Amino acid sequence: MDKRTVFIDNVVLPRNVLPMGDKVYVILTDSETIWAYHDKDGDGVSDGREMVWDGGLHTGNIEKQSSGLIWNIDNVIYNNYNRFTYHEGKLEPKGYNIGRFSQWGLARDDDGRIYGTEAGAHENANYFQFPGGYLIAHTKDIERGPEFDTPHSICRVEDQTGGGYDFKKNRVLKEFSANCGQSVIRSSLMPEFSGSLATCEPVGRLIRLNQFKKEEGIRKVYNYFPGSEFIRSSDPFFRPVWSESGPDGCFYFSDMYRGIIQEKEWFPTKGTNIKVKRYQRVKEWGMLEVFRNGRIYRLVPDDKVPLKVPKLLSKSSKELIPFLEHGSGHVRDNAQKLLVIRGDKSVVPDLNTFVKQTENPVAKMLAMWALRGLDSLSRDTVVEALGDASAQVQVAAIHLSEEFLHGGDQEMAAQVEAMKASDDMDVRMQVYLSFHARPTPSLQSIQSRLDQDLAEMTLVKRYKQVQAEEVAKASFDPVSKAGAKIYNLLCASCHGLDGKGVKSGEGLVAPSLSRNSWIRWWPDVATAIILKGQAGAELDGKPYSGGMMPAMENVYNDQQIAEVMTYIGMNFNNWKEPMTKEQVAEVRKKVASQKTMFTPAELNELRMKRGLFAPKKNK
């Protein structure tokens, strides 16, 4: 096990890695560009690269940059900011309606649902209601089981950023603070955990295992081990940051085994910020000196033998097909991916035969999506799958029927619409999603009937809400549209997509920006906070769990800050006029001498002075 090969060297912090046949796709820090590294001479070391998508720069806080890059069952590549359709080596990006899907890490299940997490917002499982590719509804308030948000840490070390501690229990973490590196367990070695989501929490020194249950018309998430955790340690240097369901069916996780894992922006070492005390504590404890001790663990179930790992690259396209039934999701995914990216249509007859003969629902779905990726999925195959005994296959077939539904196939439309009467909530919801996937005039009557017939479904109600939000966004002026993109990427994880703040226990992670007096009456001060940041999790005497607002003066220019302020002002606070880049430049000049983040006391003083200038009320 203790072997490694250096394939790519002399690069700075590669963040995303995805094997793609004989190439490896990589995204590096401070960039969104995707590079394909290759090894043309076959010596096991990359000898060149080519750009497959020019994403430009993405500088600033490394916590906010890209992660993920996974191949999904729908032949789409996902990361936390974009999903990329793949066709003959070309990538075409499309963003999410929520901006950023996840903070650090991305996972998928056998059905193609994508799972996100947020660190500062204390969320260890997000956005898992629908298969990837659809609008993402707001369901966090109704999808979590009792005590799901409570970590059961046994490490008594106070070194967190914003998680909060129970001091009656000797500084045991009481709120999730650093969720990351999630993966869905998809292995025949661990059938009891199949479909469960493992999420790393390096501040709590634990790995949470989440299980999902269909209840009351929604998929709810619960801690698999109530009152405890899947893996946890009292060792203060145990820092699990990444997990994978491996090709051999075993569970792997990466432990940085490090004293400090926080990047510098949220780890001040001098000044008046209350977090400087944390730096002083951990320095005194010697934690700054513990690094370069990382390790990878493999968890093998008792009395089980790891699965044999096939060398898929050496297999012919026809030889790949049986591996769609392999016991490891990792192997299944790569077999399907290779079938698609090779583009070898000679295997289409074999795939069609496999779809008819296999009794494995997951393998059947993978084969059908491989046929779609080869532009060879027949109508007859979809029709037959719509009548499959497995609801799981039916959902995939409805999803795959969209090409025919929106292409005018009335007979198939009638067959799919009839499935709205299914006893399975996933089937009913997929009927709704597939008919509403595009604004097709010929389907308007069916869409209207579904709006009425499925109106009581909880997820339909939430989906219609986000549809209305997208219609409203379409009417935004160009400045607000640009600001909405920045807001969703940067601000929503703490302040909420609706601007009303993200819940954390009985309070919020950060202040609500909706009908916010600072935005409405002192927009210059609010702009100054964006530029310089705020130390201390308090505003107007009210505490928040987020810790602090980082400075953005070196991340965004005046035009970008004007755009995000305009979006916040017009969307949440009834501004009548946009903020201009000239106004931001004036504020930037006014606070240039401010060398540290604003404290709550300094902000209150500015408010008493009626702002930085004599502000014009923007209401």
Task: Identify the meaning behind each predicted range.
Residues 1-319, 330, 338-340, 396:
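Beta-propeller domains with acidic blade repeats across secreted/periplasmic ectodomains
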Residues 243, 251-254, 296, 483-498, ...:
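The canonical Cys-X-X-Cys-His
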Residues 301-311, 373, 403, 436-481, ...:
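Post-cleavage N-terminal segment of exported redox proteins
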Residues 307-310, 332-343, 362-376, 381-387, ...:
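Structural detector for internal amphipathic alpha-helices that build alpha-solenoid repeat scaffolds
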Residues 466-488, 493, 501-503, 509:
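Electrostatic cytochrome c docking/interface patches
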Residues 467-479, 544-547, 551-619:
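Flexible coil segments in periplasmic/lumen-exposed cytochrome c-class electron-transfer proteins
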Residues 499-558:
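Gly/Gly-Pro-rich "capping" loops immediately C-terminal to redox-active cysteine motifs
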